[in-house]
Amino acid sequence: MSKQPENSFSSDKFFPIKQKLALEAVALVEPGMCVGLGSGSTAREFILALGDRVRTERLVITAVASSRISQLLAEAVGIPLLDHSLLQDVDLVVDGADEVDPCLRMIKGGGGALFREKILLQSGKRNVILVDERKLVPTLGKFSLPIEIAPFGCSSVQRILNKQGYFGEWRETSAGERFITDNGNYIYDVRTPDSYANPEEDMIRLLQIRGIIDVGFVIAKAEVWVGYADGSIVRKKKHNEY
């Protein structure tokens, strides 16, 4: 069984870089916007920074959170949240990623919120992904590939995955219990293969399996802001976007 990644926050030596990325991104927020809030340690810093602006500037916005954890944090810092069922267009989505390749394809889902995160990205008019330099990889696969799977028939789905060459383990909580997503599903973390030269093909193949809700690959229109140890930030985006 794989363990759910733990949050280290301020103990992370890249914490100042995450804070700087968050402060740069929060400057994009304008009055009246609907803002998509991602999940994970860098998204957490963005939510905190956005809460500061809402409080000190009386900034009028609405937001949609991609996970229960992000929702609770947003509520705690005074960010007004939109009912998930009313989600339509989102002016700005800010999130993180577990891996980013040179084509800006990503793996997400280390926190188990991949399905909702991808819905937000799909709805976003502008998507900004914040990562530190450790997340840049030549080929996706160094980080395990999370797959969200419905509980019904999950062992059968695992058998099919293994038959097609995807091997991994079910994610557990720190207490040793099966991890359950905010949608009531399980996460299967694929360890093998450990390299995806054509993630688009793998994603299509995996989504054809009944019982799979979503896959951690993100092939989406998004800017990627990379923070480096020297304090610099490089903004990357695909050609002809935005």
From Swiss-Prot:
Matches recorded under Gene3D superfamilies: 3.30.70.260, 3.40.50.1360
GO molecular function, one term: ribose-5-phosphate isomerase activity
Domain of life assignment: Bacteria
Binding residues annotated for substrate, in chain numbering: 39-42, 95-98, 108-111, 135
Enzyme Commission identifier(s): 5.3.1.6
Protein name in the entry: Ribose-5-phosphate isomerase A
Assembly behavior: Homodimer.
Family annotation (InterPro entries): NagB/RpiA_transferase-like, Ribose-5P_isomerase, Ribose5P_isomerase_typA_subgr, Ribose5P_isomerase_type_A
Organismal lineage: Bacteria, Pseudomonadati, Chlamydiota, Chlamydiia, Chlamydiales
Catalytic activity: aldehydo-D-ribose 5-phosphate = D-ribulose 5-phosphate
